[in-house]
């Protein structure tokens, strides 16, 4: 039995059978071998089999080879070749490649090209592309800003099983961006996200419990969610935890803890915390 995280039941005979199939031009076997060798960190062999699959114009192999070149897996990093193979796979109809090259262009600040590729992938039902397209619409990246289209794209992404989108939908509903403001709906989105450990939702739940928005006012629950957010690295939540300790809201007044969280928030770049430290000479 081989030590493999990917094929945890792969035997020597099964490995040899895959190698034989790959030698007989079976491109799916080549990709399986590449994934296997990558899982055991034999990256030269992984690269070899991914590259071999592209000789047969196999779109999945072309996309994966683009990724290998982009990340330098089993080869020197080469962004020119990465883009070439992503484009080749996209030309051969690989939807994920269209998303990958869109993401590639986005990282390189080529926003119109990024938008076009991501939208193409999203229009073909790829969930990750739907999520990114929503972000593009929300923030006017490569296209005119449209909160309504952002919301539609986020909902499509959720339907495809994508995670990490409840805070985006919650924010749109909370502020009335693209839809009439709906505080109850916003609370439900944030709560769903928090239940899936979507850390961006913790702060907003704290705000809504502290103000009684969409739910009965409850400082104990507000503090709980602020603390969850602070523990997850949210500088706004850290600031509010500091304020609660400073003023004894729900928790006993504790100036040392207040200073601790205030300084952490300021270190994270939160302006209110930075200003408060300067004003209070902390």
Residue locations for each model-derived region?
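Terminal, low-structured helical/coil segments at or just beyond the last alpha-helical repeat
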Residues: 2, 6-10, 264-282
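N-terminal segments that cap or nucleate solenoid repeat domains
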Residues: 2-40, 60
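Short helix-capping/linker turns of helical repeat alpha-solenoids
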Residues: 24-26, 56-59, 71-73, 91-94, ...
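Hydrophobic face of amphipathic alpha-helices that form TPR/SEL1-like repeat modules
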Residues: 30-40, 62-71, 75, 98-107, ...
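Ankyrin-repeat and related helical/solenoid repeat scaffolds used for protein-protein interactions
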Residues: 202-211, 216-272
């Amino acid at each position: 039995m081989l030590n493999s995280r990917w094929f945890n039941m792969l035997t020597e005979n099964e490995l040899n059978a895959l190698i034989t199939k790959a030698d007989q031009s079976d491109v799916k076997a080549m990709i399986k071998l590449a994934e296997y060798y990558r899982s055991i960190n034999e990256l030269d062999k992984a690269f070899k089999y991914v590259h071999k699959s592209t000789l047969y114009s196999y779109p999945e192999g072309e996309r994966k080879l683009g990724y290998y070149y982009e990340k330098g897996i089993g080869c020197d990093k080469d962004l020119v070749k990465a883009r070439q193979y992503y484009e080749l796979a996209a030309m051969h109809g690989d939807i994920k490649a269209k998303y990958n090259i869109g993401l590639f262009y986005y990282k390189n600040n080529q926003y119109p090209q990024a938008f076009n590729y991501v939208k193409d992938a999203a229009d073909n039902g790829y969930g990750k592309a739907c999520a990114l397209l929503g972000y593009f619409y929300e923030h006017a990246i490569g296209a005119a800003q449209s909160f309504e289209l952002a919301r539609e794209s986020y909902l499509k992404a959720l339907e495809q099983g994508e995670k990490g989108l409840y805070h985006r939908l919650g924010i749109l509903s909370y502020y009335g961006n693209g839809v009439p403001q709906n505080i109850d709906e916003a609370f439900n989105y944030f709560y769903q996200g928090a239940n899936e450990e979507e850390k961006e939702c913790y702060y907003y739940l704290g705000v809504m419990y502290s103000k009684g928005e969409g739910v009965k006012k409850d400082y104990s629950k507000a503090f709980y969610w602020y603390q969850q957010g602070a523990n997850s690295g949210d500088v706004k939540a850290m600031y509010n935890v500091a304020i609660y300790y400073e003023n004894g809201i729900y928790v006993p007044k504790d100036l040392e803890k207040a200073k601790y969280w205030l300084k952490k928030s300021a270190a994270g770049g939160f302006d209110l915390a930075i200003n408060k430290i300067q004003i209070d000479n902390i």
